[in-house]
Amino acid sequence: NVGLVLDTGHFMNTNPDLETEADGAEYICAMAEKLGSMKKLFRGMHLSCSLSGKYQKSCAAVPPENMDGETVMMHITSIDQHRPFTTEAARKIVECIEPAYLTHELFGDYGEISEEKLKIQLAAIGAYGSGGKSVFLCG
């Protein structure tokens, strides 16, 4: 029994030219299709949106010498944003990958799980109040 977990936000961060959720969905699905029959190995997915390309491009190649913990965390969260998808791009990704397990990897301002962000993303995939695909949540 072998399976992989796709983290959509992390994968989106590998392409700083992505500007929209639709760009991200296209990028993710193109990668999955290139895998051919190996695509079925994606058993789980951490779903979140991260469009941090502008920030990544603005960063200096060499980090400052004196970086405290707060600065490091601000840098990390500026790249790995854990935002909810708000458009049909989320549904496109879920339908393309077809994960058995879907984790909504969304964080509030203080690291807590944000119920509001969860509702936004569930609506984007069509699973909130519409009888859509079963969704498994991990906290």
Task: Give residue spans per PLM region.
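Histidine-acidic metal/acid-base catalytic patches
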Residues: 2-139
